[in-house]
């Protein structure tokens, strides 16, 4: 739905030339010939594109690219900086299939690097126990043939329960802080989103991806983190130096966190995480 509405129908609406990428990775090699002015990508493909652009230079885009619109997962701030250095704006948004694409988005002239942007016209957002609820004419009418699941997701007065946790700042910018299904219950009874702890790590240019989870040390429940390095940042470094860097990074971030939120176990991955077709890390399969 994200690709159909934001890319395909959006291009038709403004009368733009549209290129369909049936094989996204193969299409990247054709960018110099296509010369796009805008790309609509999930963050995982943004990561790949950034790596290729670093290898071949900004001309890899074809010389005309001005904007990348990304959704479906949080966009690491370091990726935004990579593209900004090449003169390309990476704009993040938020939405879901049930709301027919994006509900919030950053604009060229009104953006915040850690945010999914402001609410689009004709839509409403409210927070119920920190869960994001969405209402508008774009909201679906229900799951076909599944009234039970529809009743769980869609309220009688038209609000979609997103299952996502978030907040909005005083300027109207929205932030995604986690998923209800990912909540961990700490020994003190507190609910904690792993995404809340992962966020500071994603601000480091050395972290490509990470996962926080519950673990144990000698039978004691602790928080653990797995980190996938952004290896181009460690060119010429040994693996011991890479792991030492992340041990120090964990110490530095732990110093900013409440004691109950601190990471006690660290592992650094040489292999990628298992991912979905949209390049999202599969949290419960790694």
Region roles according to the model:
Residues 139, 173-202, 231-241, 257-263, ...:
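Adenylate-forming
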Residues 12-14, 19-129, 218-220, 231, ...:
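Conserved adenylate-forming
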Residues 95-99, 162, 187, 276-278:
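Ser/Thr-glycine-rich phosphate-binding loops at phosphate-binding pockets of nucleotides
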Residues 39-42, 125, 172, 201, ...:
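Residue-level signal for inorganic ion chemistry
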Residues 119-122, 126, 131-186, 191:
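Conserved ATP-binding/catalytic segment of the ANL
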Residues 184, 209-214, 249-286:
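Conserved C-terminal "lid"/linker of ANL adenylate-forming enzymes
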Residues 165, 204-230:
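C-terminal boundary motif of the adenylate-forming
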């Amino acid at each position: 739905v994200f690709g159909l509405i934001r890319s395909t129908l959006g291009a038709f609406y403004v009368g733009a030339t549209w290129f369909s990428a049936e094989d996204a990775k193969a299409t990247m090699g054709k960018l110099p010939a296509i010369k796009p002015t805008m790309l609509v990508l999930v963050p995982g493909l943004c990561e790949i594109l950034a790596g290729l652009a670093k290898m071949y230079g900004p001309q890899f885009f074809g010389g005309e690219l001005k904007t990348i619109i990304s959704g479906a997962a949080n966009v690491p701030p370091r990726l935004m900086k990579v593209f900004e250095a090449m003169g390309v704006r990476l704009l993040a948004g938020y939405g879901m299939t049930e709301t027919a694409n994006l509900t919030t988005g950053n604009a060229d002239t009104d953006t915040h690097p850690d945010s999914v942007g402001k609410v689009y016209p004709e839509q409403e957002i409210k927070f119920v126990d920190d869960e994001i609820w969405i209402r508008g004419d774009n909201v679906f009418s229900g799951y076909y043939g599944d009234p039970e699941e529809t009743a769980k997701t869609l309220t009688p007065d038209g609000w979609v329960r997103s299952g996502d946790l978030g907040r909005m700042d005083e300027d109207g910018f929205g932030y995604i802080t986690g998923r209800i299904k990912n909540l961990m219950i700490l020994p003190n009874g507190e609910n904690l989103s792993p995404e809340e702890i992962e966020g500071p790590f994603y601000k480091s240019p050395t972290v490509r991806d990470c996962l926080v989870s519950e673990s144990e040390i000698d039978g004691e429940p602790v928080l653990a983190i797995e980190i996938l390095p952004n290896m181009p940042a460690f060119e010429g470094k040994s693996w011991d130096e890479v792991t030492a860097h992340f041990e120090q990074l964990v110490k530095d971030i732990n110093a900013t966190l409440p004691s109950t939120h601190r990471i006690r176990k660290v592992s650094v991955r040489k292999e990628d995480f298992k991912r979905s077709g949209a390049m999202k890390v599969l949290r419960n399969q790694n």
